[in-house]
Amino acid sequence: MTIQVQQLSPDVCVAPQLGPETMAALADAGFKSVINNRPDFEGGPDQPTSAAIEAAARAAGLAYVHLPVAPGVQTPEEIARFAELLAELPRPILAFCRTGTRSGKLFRAATGG
């Protein structure tokens, strides 16, 4: 299974939509935490739910946080929470959304990068 990952810093990466089936591979690749920035059902009923992804992540030994952010402009509160997660979660961290763009924007806004 190939997972498209974009490295934003030495220990933070972003990726497009991930599902429960990818969590063990992320743990095997050395990731310690996953941040899901995609609201449930944003892509319709076939999109995996946060609960399903969280269960698989925790079973694989990963820390998991669901911080749903709508496409477009991120709020100051969402940016602040993302910054808190970057400071609190075990690294390396992988954040994802539909394409990875939203997660990348959150990272840049939260870090000034």
Regions inferred by a protein language model and the residue ranges of each:
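Cys-dependent protein tyrosine phosphatase-like superfamily
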Residues: M1-I93, R102-G113
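Short cysteine clusters
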Residues: C97
